[in-house]
Amino acid sequence: MIQVVIPMTGYGSRFVKAGYTHLKPFIKVFGKTMIEWIVSMYDQDSTEFVFICRSAHLVSDKDFQKLPFIAKHVKIVSIGWWLKLGPVNDFCRAYKEGEIDKSLPTIVNYCDLFCLWNSRSFIEECLDRDVDGSIPCYTGFHPNLIPKKNVYASCKVNSDQYLEEIKEKFSFEEDKTLAHHSAGIYYFKSGEMAYHYSNELMKHDNDSLNGEFYTSLVYNYLVKDSKKVWCPDNIKFYCQWGTPEDLEDFNMWMNVLKGACK
């Protein structure tokens, strides 16, 4: 069994400004909500999903009432008093409240993406390699990389695909198709390890971006302690839905492909 922790406490202000009426995880993309697409990326029998939500959303937004039935094994964590400090803070709060298993292999998965991959094979290889962490990456041509302004979490890796450094809103290659881009899926050997290094990150305000702590940057502290962080380029098909522009671009490309296949 693994646990997949999905922080979904945000307000999604850019989507609200763009006229969307559902919070980001519940926006429909080709007939399914974003959160349903994410759940479909994992083996249902061997995965417990831990959804971190704001208590205000659980009370006032009917979309959240669907969460208990979205997967076979579900835990919903309610966060009361909330500050916008990013997914790392949400994870740490859930851990301190005893909602994150200390010993299980743990993935923190962002709530605005989809990829085609084999999650079971990925977990098995992480266990076989006995890595402390792993960041599945995508390389090559992906439409979300075309706009010059679109930069994400970029991984600098050695010849064996182990992490040397990760930076947010950055590309280690001028040609972005050559860089290793994080897919927003973050593996840790255990919940305890994820918490320890998340807590380390939050001790350093200079490691926040606009006041938020990103899970990606936790791994620089693992590297600093000589931990093994594997960055396989095993994501061949990736969908980025983080902003209204990302979603519009995705829909445009899907319509182009549908037209080409007629």
Question: Where are each of the predicted segments found?
Answer:
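The conserved acidic donor/metal-binding loop of glycosyltransferases
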Residues: Y110-F114
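Conserved N-terminal catalytic core of the sugar/cofactor nucleotidyltransferase
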Residues: I2-I6, R14-V16, Y20, K28, ...
